[in-house]
Amino acid sequence: MATRYIPLSLKHTATPQVENFALLAGLEAAVRGVLVSAMPLAVYEVLGDAQSTSAAYFMAGVVALGWGLMVPWATRLIPRRWAYTSGCGLYLLGMALAITGTTWSVSLALICNAMATATTFVCFNAYILDYVDRANLGRSQSVQMVYAATPWSVGPMLGVWLHHLWAPAPFLLAGIFALAYYS
């Protein structure tokens, strides 16, 4: 066999399977599920009123929209794996900023988390289109939903509960999930 004499470092890595992408979808759901409830509480606490909180979310949304539209262009200049890694890094930066708890840091954390979500979403879906054949796309989405169901069900409740125990706790947990998502 021809591959018998090829050193291990030269062998091609295995193609990712549907379950591998579903695991990534579950980890992303864990990060976002905890943040979807804890982040509004943190923003409201530091800004003090609903109007300022709404303005902060509007600005984060505008920035994330522009950023998300630029991700495909950016992946032409840098490899997609580095764009994906930068998205995970933005999640970690957002968690670190949210833990500090100042007005500016929590507002910047909101923007970083929105940019991270846009980046990882675009890169993740591009990877799925690259590695999952057309016949398995329906199965891929179904398996992703199964892996993401529990984090999306438990995460918001867990985020609020942890926030009431200790304000930085949901961000630490989301940071741990973001590190696992990066790995």
Spans of model-derived segments:
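Helix-loop boundary and gating motifs at the non-cytosolic
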Residues: 6-61
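Residue-level signature of mid-helix packing/kink "hotspots" within the transmembrane helices
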Residues: 61-69, 152-153
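Structural signature of the two symmetry-related core transmembrane helices
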Residues: 82-96
